[in-house]
Amino acid sequence: LGAPVADIEPSLVVLDTETTGLTAPIGVVELAWVRINMDMEVLDEFDTLVNPERDIEPGAFGVHGISQQDVAGAPTLAEAIQPLQGQPVYVIGHNIAFDLRIVGGHLDVAGDVCTLALSRQYLKGTPERPLLNHKLTTVREFLDLPCLDAHRALGDTHTSLNVLRRILHDHGLTLDKIIKRQAKPRLLHTMPFGKHAGLTLSLVPLEYRRWLLGAGNLDKDLAYSLRKLDPQ
């Protein structure tokens, strides 16, 4: 028998996609990632346009400015994502559940860290300095971080990384600690967003809770908490 194969240490990747829109099936038009170490130092980065093999919705084009002509000669998602394959990856990003719905099937995902969930947990506005929502641009402005080509994949990966660094620094946390904590879902007690924001989860209408679960675009903490309330 040959010698046992050693476990491969997962890569740490901050990832973002720009897409064809929100209508399924959703395609990727731009893919970017920044590979980091546990000290959140950048090791390398990657950015490419992607041929989604479907039409780009006008609303999506209005956000990222990527046209059908721009992606006509670009690699497909299966081709573009190959450099991340062949090893497990911890995937980090803002609302990373959305990106993983699209690209997760191409990856060996060891775990994920969502900066949207971290911002909801740790960032609190005040009457003098309100935090209106937890969108990436809003959080960046709230933290006085530099604007890095918003709504383009590589710019958003660097902004997500800066948000991660800032939250961890301000709260005395390490990436290693966050990864270990994120491995287990956190039980939420109040609705973090939307028309029922701030309401005790058990008081949110059952139909709305089930609709959220069916939408399939939730961070793991909220999905776990909703399923605890309604195991069916």
Which residue stretches match the model-derived regions?
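Conserved non-catalytic scaffold segment of RNase H-like nuclease domains
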Residues: L1-D112, A117-R120, K124-H151
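Acidic two-metal-ion nuclease catalytic site recognized across multiple nuclease folds
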Residues: L1-D7, R165-Q232
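Generic secondary-structure boundary signal with a strong preference for alpha-helix termini
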Residues: L77, G105, T126, D156, ...
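Short runs of predominantly hydrophobic/aromatic residues within well-ordered alpha helices
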Residues: T115, T157-S160, P205, R209
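Active-site catalytic microenvironments for nucleophilic, acid-base chemistry
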Residues: Q121, F142, V163-D170
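Short, charged, surface-exposed loops that flank catalytic or proteolytic processing sites
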Residues: A150-A153, L173-L175
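Acidic, divalent-metal-coordinating active-site segment for phosphoryl/phosphodiester hydrolysis
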Residues: R152-R165
